[in-house]
């Protein structure tokens, strides 16, 4: 199950009438890119306005875009145009290099309806924001702060209930081998804890909600004072400065929210 959130786009209401499809998860070579092209063409014969989302953390091997797959990373839109409209890059690749964002965005064609989203999957690891077990609360919450600051129009998470298969719903929950603890799992079967069949939310998904609400505060502030002022507020309060520089407790976030309330309540 994918969890995608359209929290930045001023035209997000239009997505209610569109279909978004992902044809291939993290393609690595030109053969896999050709699969995306073929599936995209086939989908358009049935749904002409479908929007194709492609996740990737490197450029395609075997291409002539650049000397290495890392250098080709920013050039991916040139390979997949017009077969992808939403280019979704891994935060792991960006690391702490926020300058890479400009390189990625520079290759996009907004006039063709192209967008840039980000995602986390396995990486990045501590101290950068992610949703693994064992990370602090603000580290979970900062995934949203990071995505907003970088300027994408959406965010994708690869899975929300991807624990190991079990024969009965009440079986002990086991995370998938080879993945960081909690990766791809944000809620649990209710039967594990009681007779209820209602899913049980994790603390992490509650923190994700808090991060999404923080985005709404920042968007409100932006609507009144402009995005640059909202970015300055995020940094001035110490809530979030970068992927390895953010608040370790919720005090600065409360200050940020309080300032938004004070200046926007009238």
Where are these regions (language model features)?
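Short, solvent-exposed loop/turn segments at secondary-structure junctions
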Residues: 11-13, 59, 94, 123-124, ...
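Glycine-rich, aromatic-lined ligand/substrate-binding cores of catalytic
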Residues: 139, 151-163
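Alpha-helical scaffolding within the catalytic cores
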Residues: 38, 63-77, 94-108, 139-142
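Glycoside hydrolase catalytic-domain groove-lining segments
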Residues: 76-124
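Catalytic domains of carbohydrate-active enzymes that cleave complex glycans
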Residues: 2-71, 75-76, 152-153, 168-266
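Active-site clefts of carbohydrate-active enzymes
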Residues: 62, 110-142, 159
């Amino acid at each position: 199950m994918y969890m995608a959130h359209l929290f930045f786009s001023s035209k997000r209401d239009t997505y209610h009438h569109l279909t978004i499809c992902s044809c291939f998860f993290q393609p690595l070579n030109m053969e896999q890119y050709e699969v995306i092209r073929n599936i995209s063409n086939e989908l358009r014969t049935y749904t002409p306005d479908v929007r194709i989302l492609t996740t990737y953390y490197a450029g395609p091997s075997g291409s002539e875009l650049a000397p290495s797959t890392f250098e080709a990373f920013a050039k991916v839109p040139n390979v997949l145009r017009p077969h992808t409209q939403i280019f979704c890059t891994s935060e792991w690749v960006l690391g702490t290099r926020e300058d890479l964002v400009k390189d990625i965005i520079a290759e996009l064609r907004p006039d063709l309806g192209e967008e840039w989203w980000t995602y986390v999957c396995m990486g990045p690891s501590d101290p950068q924001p992610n949703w693994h077990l064992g990370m602090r609360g603000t580290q979970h919450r900062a995934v949203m702060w990071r995505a907003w600051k970088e300027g994408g129009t959406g965010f994708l998470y690869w899975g929300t209930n991807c624990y190991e298969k079990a024969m009965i719903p009440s079986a002990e929950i086991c995370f998938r081998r080879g993945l960081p603890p909690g990766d791809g799992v944000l809620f649990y079967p209710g039967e594990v804890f009681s007779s209820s069949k209602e899913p049980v939310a994790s603390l992490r998904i509650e923190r994700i909600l808090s991060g999404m609400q923080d985005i709404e505060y920042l968007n409100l502030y932006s609507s009144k004072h402009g995005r640059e002022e909202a970015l300055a507020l995020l940094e001035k309060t110490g809530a979030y400065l970068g992927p390895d520089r953010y608040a370790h407790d919720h005090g600065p976030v409360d200050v940020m929210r309080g300032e938004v309330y004070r200046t926007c309540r009238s």
